[in-house]
Regions:
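N-terminal DNA-binding module of tyrosine recombinases/phage integrases
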Residues: 1-47
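N-terminal core-binding DNA-recognition domain of tyrosine recombinases/integrases
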Residues: 27-37, 47-135, 151-154
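Short, charged phosphate-coordinating catalytic segments
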Residues: 110-119, 170-191
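Long, amphipathic, Lys/Arg-enriched alpha-helical "connector/arm" segment
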Residues: 131-161
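Active-site/catalytic core of tyrosine-dependent DNA strand-transfer enzymes
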Residues: 145, 210-278
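Short, basic (Lys/Arg/His-rich) helix/loop patches that form interaction surfaces
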Residues: 155-158, 256, 265-297
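C-terminal catalytic core of tyrosine-transesterase DNA break-rejoin enzymes
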Residues: 168, 172, 176-179, 287-297
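Conserved tyrosine-mediated DNA breakage-rejoining catalytic core shared by Y-recombinases
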Residues: 183-225, 235-236
Length: 297
């Protein structure tokens, strides 16, 4: 009997993988599959639990991480100390963020169970928060939406005009997600229609361009002749990159989109304070409002 066989027969303990290296492999696979939103979320989940363990590079053996007690400690740490993305925000993560990170870990755990790395414990995540906390109602009332539609954009501060225009276009384009608006190409406009592929599903969509949307498109379209995009949302340094002989990769474009999304939502908050005090505006609101008003029409 070989030494290796003898160790297996005697039940020699198998070295457990480290969570950081394992999750990094998962993230790389998600990026290879172009599931960038999931890869982005997993990356932040990994940064969070690494911070809980003392910072990047600290060992995180999976058999220690995936225990009810350790997961509960991590949850309590996130509630108390988890760092916000914005520096000025207080410590402590929202319930939705805690749930997202825990559900990411749960998915990683199930992947390890499927690969026989860890045994299955059906109650492992029973004592930690994995629900999705319902947020403040996202859909606007008809009167509130009409307030935005009837706003004279010229009376807004210059940095807010295009933000409200994009929000209105998302609504007028049948609740188009911000990511699809950002990735719209000039060639997607076919007369009075837009034909494009959903970024999330790849499904081809066709939307009619209402008169109000056509006017907004003319005013806020991308005026860079070298850009393929309909609106100047992605990579404002596009022409500079081309002159330097550089072409942005998909991942870089997605990071540009995330930066644009953060700025978009921050400015929507300012618009809400000016036009709809007490109402929360975000990129999701246009989509939810269109769906709600269309349903009740």
């Amino acid at each position: 009997m070989s030494k290796k066989e003898k160790n297996v027969e005697m039940g020699s303990p198998m070295k457990m993988p480290d969570l950081a290296s394992y999750m990094q492999t998962v993230i790389e696979q998600l990026e290879a599959d172009k599931k960038r939103s999931a890869a982005h979320t997993y990356t932040y989940a990994l940064k969070s639990i690494a911070e809980f363990y003392g910072g990047a590079g600290m060992p995180m053996p999976v058999d220690e991480v995936f225990t009810p007690g350790r997961l509960k400690e991590y949850e309590e740490w996130m509630r108390r100390e988890g760092m916000r993305k914005r520096k000025r925000e207080p410590k402590g993560l929202s319930l939705n963020t805690i749930s997202t990170y825990m559900r990411n870990l749960k998915a990683v755990y199930h992947r390890m169970v499927g690969e026989k790395v860890l045994p299955y414990n059906p109650k492992l995540f029973d004592d930690v928060y994995t629900k999705v906390e319902s947020q403040t109602k996202r859909a606007l009332e008809l009167e509130q939406m009409n307030t935005l539609l009837c706003t004279d954009l010229r009376k807004l501060p210059s940095d807010l005009r295009c933000v409200l225009a994009y929000f209105l276009l998302m609504f007028l384009f049948r609740g188009m997600p911000f990511i699809d608006l950002a990735y719209l190409r000039k060639q997607d406009v076919k007369g009075n229609r837009i034909v494009y592929s959903r970024h999330k599903t790849g499904r081809q969509m066709t939307v009619r361009i209402p008169k109000e949307a056509m006017e907004l498109m003319k005013e806020f379209k991308n005026r860079n002749p070298d850009s393929i995009y309909l609106f100047p949302i992605l990579h404002k340094q596009e022409s500079k990159k081309k002159r330097a002989g550089k072409v942005k990769k998909d991942k870089e474009l997605y990071m540009d989109y995330l930066r644009a999304l953060r700025g978009f939502n921050l400015k929507l908050e300012k618009i809400a304070s000016l036009l709809l005090p007490g109402v929360k505006l975000s990129s999701y609101v246009a989509r939810h409002t269109w769906a709600t008003l269309a349903f009740h029409a």
